[in-house]
């Protein structure tokens, strides 16, 4: 169904439903249903012309006719998904609204949530339209003055995001992946609730399991808490959360479900300089020095994975480099050594430059080792913010050169070498190749970079707008990772009283807090179920109950019990009962209930949860909801909105997001998209695999276009309906398996020697 037909069908159904519920009397539920359909009609009619314009020019930004992908197309596709869901829901309501089994409260909650999402998508479409008018033809990233980019960011971070993390979570992705995203979001908000209080690791995870029940049954609360976390918690929180997969119990479970390999060994490469021959003249050599930046010389860790035990992999030299990881279970009898492979894959993992290791990526790397039949050498580089740029690049380059020189120890002859990585690892694959060319040593025979980030500048692009709704790559989290990697992140110190507790004091404190959380979690579950059933829970007399009262006003969802109340008795969950005026207007409500709920949802005040989003006083926060002050001499982005349209504003009070104007983010070894032509011409064939709904999509499209313009061999494959990081979700569903298989095909293409020319 084309966009215009879909919009017209939705408008017709909305008008029919609006007329029906308007005639149902003065009841609160009927009034809200009528209002929400009026809002759907208004937003759909306002959005359709803008989407049509974006779609009409989107082909100018594609790599070629065979690869129709860029941020403008992705925004239109996302808006169509939202419109399609509203169309489906409107049809359902029209067909079942007279039935005694019609769940008015459930359908109202979904309609209000998706109307809020549609309103925000309309704002994003206007942003994209503004970019379209100020960018050069064919350019996706804004290249103008930094003031306008800062104004974009200032306007952008004030938009409300919670609607995308509640009932609408992951609506743009394939349905098979949405349950995982919901589980991830519940785990995130539960983990964030205990972060900075239980600092000793596993207790945070354990407490989250017992106290996160209310987030599972209350999508609105989950969305509000998700928004608070992504805007206020620092990069150390994200390191801790993303590294949950490093916990031995979880990693063991993941390995049980993955392919069994003969070799999976962690190696420690000594920080000793060695010589490498120059490709221009092998008789000459260049010295490869160990990494020195920030922390001085230190061993570099890497993991060797091989499906078969090959010659050299159990040599005395390699055994001396092996690092103990505890006893490992040998599931199959020790085989005879297979001959060395003719190829080698050097892998660099992702994780935003701040988290994860090869252990997190081991499940899919084992599958690669089996399918490709070659050894895989995965580098564990030092992570930011403790080791900012260029430490990771130095370590990856050092480890790559070591692997090329000592490939016989890794079970390979090194005839063909592929550099492969995802996300931040894809960035490092490209920059390692640039550095190898600069040193004059052997570059890999090809690069496979999955959804890489190719520019770390704070530049607006249509695909970056998707970070407003992306549960894996929110804009503020991207900024925190960039800040950490570039070395501009403020140092975060533990509280002095925590240091004074000592190890035993921390254990005693965490045990006490864990038992308290267990009791409060059980009480929270009971209260939630009692509220959902229409019963009023008894008041607790526990002194610790005071600590959970600020969230009580957010806890109640739109439920049948709440909607069954007589008109005028709105209860305390006004946040869940937003009318269409509330959903489409950023002006503060005059309702005391709304004022109270907005106050309840305000940001946390402790300084230890503020990263680089500077604190502001309450008056500034209130003004920011209605007014975003422009910089001097800079056009206002708000002018992109037509008169009468007001997107929803965030209640979190975020007033600032740093603009990375430091020259370091323009370094070509940090942002290869900004590298001069002479450097990019030294790259080997590059194979990019991107996601159509990834905020990093435009990075891949523009990088491929630059290489294509230079005559460099490059391919770009864009997979549909999958989020950033699909390699780590390879076993989740058919779509992720197919996307992962395509990455394997690209690696296999690189490792295949070119056909000999015919005489």
From Swiss-Prot:
It catalyses: a diacylglycerol + H2O = a monoacylglycerol + a fatty acid + H(+); a triacylglycerol + H2O = a diacylglycerol + a fatty acid + H(+); a monoacylglycerol + H2O = glycerol + a fatty acid + H(+); Hydrolyzes glycerol monoesters of long-chain fatty acids. GO terms for molecular function: all-trans-retinyl-palmitate hydrolase, all-trans-retinol forming activity; diacylglycerol lipase activity; monoacylglycerol lipase activity; protein kinase binding; retinyl-palmitate esterase activity; rRNA primary transcript binding; serine hydrolase activity; sterol ester esterase activity. It comes from the Eukaryota. The modification Phosphoserine is found at residues 557, 559, 597, 618, 650-651. Phosphorylation by AMPK reduces its translocation towards the lipid droplets. Residues 534-553, 583-604 are annotated as: Disordered. One of its GO terms (biological process) is cholesterol metabolic process. SUPFAM superfamilies: alpha/beta-Hydrolases (SSF53474). The keyword Phosphoprotein applies. Monomer and homodimer. Interacts with CAVIN1 in the adipocyte cytoplasm. Interacts with PLIN5. PANTHER family: HORMONE-SENSITIVE LIPASE (PTHR23025:SF3), TRIACYLGLYCEROL LIPASE (PTHR23025). Belongs to the 'GDXG' lipolytic enzyme family. Lipase with broad substrate specificity, catalyzing the hydrolysis of triacylglycerols (TAGs), diacylglycerols (DAGs), monoacylglycerols (MAGs), cholesteryl esters and retinyl esters. Shows a preferential hydrolysis of DAGs over TAGs and MAGs and of the fatty acid (FA) esters at the sn-1 and sn-2 positions of the glycerol backbone in TAGs. Preferentially hydrolyzes FA esters at the sn-3 position of the glycerol backbone in DAGs. This is Hormone-sensitive lipase. It comes from Mus musculus (Mouse).
């Amino acid at each position: 169904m084309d966009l215009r037909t879909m919009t017209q069908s939705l408008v017709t159904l909305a008008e029919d439903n609006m007329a029906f519920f308007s005639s149902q009397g003065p009841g609160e539920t009927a009034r809200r249903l009528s209002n929400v359909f009026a809002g759907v009609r208004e937003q759909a009619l306002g959005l359709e012309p803008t989407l049509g314009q974006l779609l009409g020019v989107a082909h100018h930004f594609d790599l070629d006719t065979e690869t129709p992908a860029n941020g403008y197309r992705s925004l239109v596709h996302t808006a169509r998904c939202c419109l399609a869901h509203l169309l489906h829901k409107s049809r359902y309501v029209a067909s079942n609204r007279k039935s005694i089994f019609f769940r008015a409260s459930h359908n109202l909650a979904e309609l209000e949530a998706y109307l809020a999402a549609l309103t925000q998508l309309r704002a994003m479409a206007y942003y994209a339209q503004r970019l379209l008018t100020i960018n050069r033809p064919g350019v996706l990233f804004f290249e103008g003055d930094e003031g306008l980019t800062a104004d974009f960011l200032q306007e952008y971070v004030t938009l409300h995001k919670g609607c995308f993390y509640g009932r609408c979570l992951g609506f743009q992705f394939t349905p098979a992946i949405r349950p995982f995203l919901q589980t991830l979001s519940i785990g995130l908000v539960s983990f964030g609730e205990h972060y900075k209080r239980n600092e000793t690791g596993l207790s945070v995870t354990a407490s989250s399991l017992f106290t996160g029940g209310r987030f599972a049954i209350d999508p609105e609360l989950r969305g509000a808490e998700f928004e608070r976390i992504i805007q206020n918690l620092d990069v150390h929180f994200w390191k801790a959360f993303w590294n949950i997969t490093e916990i031995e119990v979880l990693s063991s479970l993941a390995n049980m479900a993955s392919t069994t390999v003969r070799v999976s060994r962690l190696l420690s490469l000594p920080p000793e300089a060695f010589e490498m021959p120059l490709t221009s003249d092998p008789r000459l050599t260049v010295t490869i020095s160990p990494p020195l930046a920030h922390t001085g010389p230190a061993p570099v860790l890497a993991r060797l994975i091989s499906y078969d035990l090959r010659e050299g992999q159990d040599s005395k030299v390699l055994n001396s480099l092996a690092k103990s990881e505890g006893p490992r279970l040998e599931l199959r009898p020790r085989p005879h050594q297979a001959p060395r492979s003719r190829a080698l894959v050097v892998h660099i993992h992702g994780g935003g430059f701040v988290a994860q290791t090869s252990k997190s990526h081991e499940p899919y790397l084992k599958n690669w080792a089996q399918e490709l039949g070659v050894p895989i050498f995965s580098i564990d580089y030092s992570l930011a913010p403790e080791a900012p740029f260029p430490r990771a690049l130095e370590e990856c380059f050092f480890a790559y050169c070591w692997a090329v020189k000592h490939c016989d120890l890794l079970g390979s002859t090194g005839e063909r070498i592929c550099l492969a990585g995802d996300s931040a690892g894809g960035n490092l694959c490209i920059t390692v190749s640039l550095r190898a060319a600069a040193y004059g040593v052997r570059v890999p025979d090809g690069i496979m970079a999955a959804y890489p980030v190719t520019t770390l500048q704070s530049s607006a692009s249509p695909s970056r707008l998707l970070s407003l709704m992306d549960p894996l790559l929110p804009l503020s989290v991207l900024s925190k990772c960039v800040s950490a990697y570039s070395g501009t992140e403020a140092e975060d110190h533990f509280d002095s009283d925590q240091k004074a507790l000592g190890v035993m004091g921390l254990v005693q404190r965490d045990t006490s807090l864990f038992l308290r959380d267990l009791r409060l979690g059980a009480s929270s579950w009971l209260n939630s179920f009692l509220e959902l059933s229409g019963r009023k829970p008894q008041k607790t007399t526990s002194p610790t109950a005071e600590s959970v009262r600020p969230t009580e006003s957010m806890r109640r969802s739109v439920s049948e019990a709440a909607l069954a109340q007589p008109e005028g008795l709105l209860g305390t969950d006004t946040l869940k009962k937003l009318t269409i005026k509330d959903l489409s207007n950023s002006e503060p409500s005059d309702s005391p209930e709304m004022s109270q709920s907005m106050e309840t949802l305000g940001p946390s005040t402790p300084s230890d949860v503020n990263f680089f989003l500077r604190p502001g006083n309450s008056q500034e926060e209130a003004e920011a909801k209605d007014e975003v002050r422009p910089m001097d001499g800079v056009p206002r982005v708000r002018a992109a909105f037509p008169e009468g349209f007001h997107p929803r504003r965030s209640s979190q009070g975020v007033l600032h997001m740093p603009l990375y104007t430091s020259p370091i983010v323009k370094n070509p070894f940090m942002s290869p998209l900004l590298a001069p032509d002479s450097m990019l011409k030294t790259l080997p064939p590059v194979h990019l695999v991107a996601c159509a709904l990834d905020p990093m999509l435009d990075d891949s499209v523009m990088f491929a276009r630059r290489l294509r313009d230079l005559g460099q061999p490059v391919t770009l494959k864009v997979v549909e309906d999958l989020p950033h990081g699909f390699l780590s979700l390879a076993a989740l569903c058919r779509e992720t398996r197919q996307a992962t298989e395509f990455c394997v095909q690209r690696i296999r293409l690189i490792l295949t020697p070119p056909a000999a020319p015919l005489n």
